[in-house]
């Protein structure tokens, strides 16, 4: 028997898993978007346009007003941020059942929502994006608490507060220039809004907002990339080993020898009702073993029809084979004397 191998199936599964892990490691964090009127990029010529690639992450942040931070506006602004398609974003309209990303309604907390650009999301409520498609993030309220529920116009029209996401594209049609990962803020969540005020706990309220810690001077430094890459590589090797072990077990089972159980053929049975089970060397008849039983399925003469025609035809179709024996006419046993 040759050495076990995982086979082509195990290699393909391992390669797909490795590619998935490498994709998670290779994604970059884009420059965060601070959502208030103090962000001058909303008034830039051509609008606020980003070119994310599949695997990247983007932070949306609502800066606090109390105490004021480096990105705070003079007065706190209340917004709901929606993810819409290209046509709706150009009209500054959200659908009746909008895809809500983040609600900015807590003046004393920094709130954050992280978007993961992925084609397939493992989360039921996760967002999915297609490469070479355009998406918009818009705010249709007017900045006041009373206008939060508006689904049309708002600051999207009056102040140009919308972000165009050109997924998988580039402004020059080539490779997209990216900043090093060390200059980007660390991603703290998987598609949930976060409070970034240090020393504060989660507060009840909107389900899109959860609290986490963040320094007043900016985002925390990212984790060590060699450590992340090493952990991802170890996970990939573990998954490859599991796939290889499974393939080896399947290969060994295929190579296993067939069962050595022996079933006698129909010719081993005698005529006249004798099943040929007698022992040799003068020994008496022995008991039949499982699989050696002959079953007579016909009558004694040619005129007698078979009393079990079905099993005569398909006797080998169910489990262990059943051997069909043509029974002869009944005979008196020889050498038997009767005492009178």
From Swiss-Prot:
Protein name: Ephrin-B3
A Gene Ontology molecular function term of the record: ephrin receptor binding
Glycosylated residues in this chain: 210
Xref: Pfam families: Ephrin (PF00812)
Gly residues biased stretches: 267-284
Keywords carried by this UniProt record: Developmental protein, Differentiation, Disulfide bond, Glycoprotein, Host cell receptor for virus entry, Host-virus interaction, Membrane, Methylation, Neurogenesis, Phosphoprotein, Receptor, Signal, Transmembrane, Transmembrane helix
Subcellular compartments: Membrane
Residues bearing PTM Omega-N-methylarginine: 271
Gene: EFNB3
Signal peptide from the UniProt entry: 1-27
Domain of life: Eukaryota
InterPro entries, sorted: Cupredoxin, Ephrin, Ephrin_CS, Ephrin_RBD
Record-level GO BP terms: adult walking behavior; axon choice point recognition; axon guidance; cell-cell signaling; ephrin receptor signaling pathway; negative regulation of axonogenesis; nervous system development; T cell costimulation
Record-level GO cellular component terms: glutamatergic synapse; hippocampal mossy fiber to CA3 synapse; plasma membrane; presynaptic membrane
Purpose: Cell surface transmembrane ligand for Eph receptors, a family of receptor tyrosine kinases which are crucial for migration, repulsion and adhesion during neuronal, vascular and epithelial development. Binds promiscuously Eph receptors residing on adjacent cells, leading to contact-dependent bidirectional signaling into neighboring cells. The signaling pathway downstream of the receptor is referred to as forward signaling while the signaling pathway downstream of the ephrin ligand is referred to as reverse signaling. May play a pivotal role in forebrain function.
Membrane-topology annotation of the record: Single-pass type I membrane protein
Modified residues (Phosphoserine): 274
Disulphide-bonded residues: 62-104, 92-156
Gene3D superfamilies, A to Z: Cupredoxins - blue copper proteins
Region (Disordered): 168-225, 254-298
């Amino acid at each position: 028997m040759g050495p076990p191998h995982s086979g082509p199936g195990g290699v393909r599964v391992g390669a797909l898993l490795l590619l998935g892990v490498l994709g998670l490691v290779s994604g970059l964090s884009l420059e965060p978007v601070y959502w208030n009127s103090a962000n001058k990029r909303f008034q830039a010529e051509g609008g606020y346009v980003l070119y994310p690639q599949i695997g990247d992450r983007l932070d949306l942040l609502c800066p606090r007003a109390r105490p004021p931070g480096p990105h705070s506006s003079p007065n706190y602004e209340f917004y709901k941020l929606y993810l819409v398609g290209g046509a709706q974003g150009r009209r500054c309209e959200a659908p009746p059942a909008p895809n809500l990303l983040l609600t900015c309604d807590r003046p004393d907390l920094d709130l954050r929502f992280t978007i993961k650009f992925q084609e397939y999301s493992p989360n039921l409520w996760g967002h999915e994006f297609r490469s070479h498609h355009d998406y918009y993030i818009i705010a249709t309220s007017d900045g006041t608490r009373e206008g939060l529920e508006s689904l049309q116009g708002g600051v999207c029209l009056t102040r140009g507060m919308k972000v165009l996401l050109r997924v998988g594209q580039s402004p020059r049609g080539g490779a997209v220039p990216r900043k090093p990962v060390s200059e980007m803020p660390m991603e703290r969540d998987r598609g949930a809004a976060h409070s970034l005020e240090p020393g504060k706990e989660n507060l009840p309220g909107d389900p899109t907002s959860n609290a986490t810690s963040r320094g007043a001077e900016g985002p925390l430094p990212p984790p060590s990339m060699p450590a992340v890459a090493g952990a991802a590589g170890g996970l990939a090797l573990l998954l490859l080993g599991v796939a290889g072990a499974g393939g080896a077990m399947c290969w060994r089972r295929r190579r296993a020898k067939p069962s050595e159980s022996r079933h006698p053929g129909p010719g081993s049975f005698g005529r006249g009702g004798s099943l040929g089970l007698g022992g040799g060397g003068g020994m008496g008849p022995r008991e039949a073993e499982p699989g050696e039983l002959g079953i007579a399925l016909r009558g004694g003469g040619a005129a007698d029809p078979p009393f079990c025609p079905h099993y005569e035809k398909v006797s080998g179709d169910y489990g262990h084979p059943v051997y069909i024996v043509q029974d002869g006419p009944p005979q008196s046993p020889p050498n038997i004397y009767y005492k009178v």
